[in-house]
UniProtKB/Swiss-Prot annotation:
Extra remark: The mucAB operon is the plasmid-borne analog of the E.coli umuDC operon.
Record organism: Salmonella typhimurium
Keywords on record: DNA damage, DNA repair, Plasmid, SOS mutagenesis, SOS response
Sample GO molecular function, one term: damaged DNA binding
GO CC, one annotated term: cytosol
Pfam family, one: IMS_C
One of the protein's GO biological processes: error-prone translesion synthesis
Protein name in the entry: Protein MucB
Claim: Flavoprotein is one of the keywords in the record: no
Keyword Chaperone annotated: no
């Protein structure tokens, strides 16, 4: 048996967690550069906001319903996600973090102590008590069925936020009323293709010929069909495979037109990518930089390019990665262009045990690991407490986040103050 715990409106819920005054108010969160709606709580959905709505188009709705709007605060969301995971891991032995707001749990052995429904309600209550985040819990024989149960738990209030189904008849009833688009991994194209075969509900898919499904759509959807029948094909991934690449990129708050500004942006991206690389305990040999204009601008000259530098010795040193990124940028930079986005990608990873080739002349910088450890240690106490001069200080091109909330959980200066009167 598997449980899926999914936070309701994660980003919006995180914003409400430290603002009691927003408890009964509609809340929504915007994408990068305050462009589109990417998260809403129940009241914001009820007011008519939809995922992907451009902010400038729905401002009348926002003002009419007094909806609280926030810029995306990824530092806060990541911190709250870690707290959410820690609470669940304190109650379950085998946990897989599927996304920032979703966790799978192996429920093996749980029924010896309590019912699955009681376990689901305990998970939900403990998460709410320790984080204030409200989640839905779905429990079933397979991960795919647990996803469906979770959908039911979050859709119908009468469930109390928990649906645990091990009964064939009740599962069939649920599958018969859900459209096939609700199945984990079934996208819009697959949904349309299945409809031409007369498969419109989840139950229709569960009853489909697995050989035909495999021949038409591939082995993954065939396994999904088997999962809908109660056969576990997707196991829990407690230790996800190591990343094969790291990408740090941003759309600029305003167009970048000077080499100095672009160099500062690329330095910042490279420094952040190197930090992520060290968190993964990996080393890289390949550093790529890409820059591009906006494909939607009809007035600007269109240009997009990418360059790659390959190192002789794998590294995780920010200085080396920044230097390589700047070399790559120099090869593709063009003047008199209004750039809308840039990014840095690291690839060709290896572990610390990677050795120099016999004929390698380069050697790692002395004291590199110790220096990077000091850098990361200082920055754990506050973002960019210590940064590279090449990143600049006043970045006019920085991502636009005019409604950014404080970093309540990671910055001492942002800890909420309670006043007793």
């Amino acid at each position: 048996m598997f449980a899926l715990i999914d936070v309701n409106g994660m980003y919006a819920s995180c914003e409400q967690a430290f603002r009691p005054d927003l408890a009964n108010r509609a809340v929504a969160v915007l994408s990068n550069n305050d462009g589109n709606i990417v998260a809403r709580n129940y009241l914001a959905k009820k007011a008519g906001l939809k995922m992907g709505d451009p902010y400038f188009k729905v401002r009348p709705i926002i003002e009419r319903h007094n909806i609280a709007i926030f810029s995306s605060n990824y530092t806060l969301y990541a911190s709250m996600s870690a707290r959410f995971a820690a609470v669940v891991e304190s109650l379950a032995s085998h946990v897989e973090q599927y996304s920032i707001d979703e966790l799978f749990v192996d429920c093996k052995g749980i029924t010896a102590a309590m019912s699955l429904d009681a376990f689901g309600r305990q998970l939900r209550e403990e998460v709410r008590r320790h984080t204030t985040l409200v989640c839905g819990v779905g429990i079933a024989r397979t991960k795919t069925l647990a996803k469906l149960c979770n959908h039911a738990a979050k859709t119908w209030p009468a469930t109390g936020g928990v649906v645990a189904l091990d009964d064939g008849a009740r599962l069939k009833k649920l599958m018969s009323i859900l459209p096939v688009a609700e199945v984990w991994g079934v996208g819009h194209r697959t949904e349309k293709a299945l409809a031409t075969m007369g498969i419109k509900t989840v139950l229709d898919l569960a009853r489909a010929d697995t050989r035909l499904i495999r021949k038409t759509f591939g082995v993954v959807l065939e396994r999904t069909v088997r999962e809908l029948r109660g056969e576990a094909c997707f196991s829990l991934e407690e230790n996800p495979p190591a990343k094969q690449q790291i990408v740090v990129s941003r759309s600029f708050g305003q167009r970048v037109e000077t080499l100095t500004d672009m160099q500062q942006a690329v330095t910042g991206f490279a420094a952040r990518a190197a930090e992520k690389l060290r968190n993964e305990r990996q080393y890289c040999r390949v550093i790529s930089v890409f820059i591009r204009t906006s494909p939607y601008s009809v007035r600007d000259t269109q240009y997009a390019n990418q360059a790659t530098e390959k190192l002789t010795v794998a590294t995780q040193d920010s200085r080396t990665i920044i230097q390589a990124a700047q070399a790559a940028l120099a090869r593709i930079w063009r003047e008199d262009i209004a750039y809308a986005k840039a990014g840095v990608m690291l690839a060709d990873f290896s572990g610390k045990e990677a050795q120099l080739d016999l004929f390698d002349s380069a050697t790692p910088s002395a004291g590199s690991e110790a220096l990077m450890a000091v850098l990361d240690g200082i920055n754990r106490r506050g973002k960019n407490q210590l940064f590279f001069a090449g990143q600049g200080i006043d970045n006019s091109f920085a991502m636009r986040r005019q409604m950014l909330s404080p970093d309540y959980t990671t910055d001492w200066r942002s800890i909420p103050i309670a006043t007793i009167k």
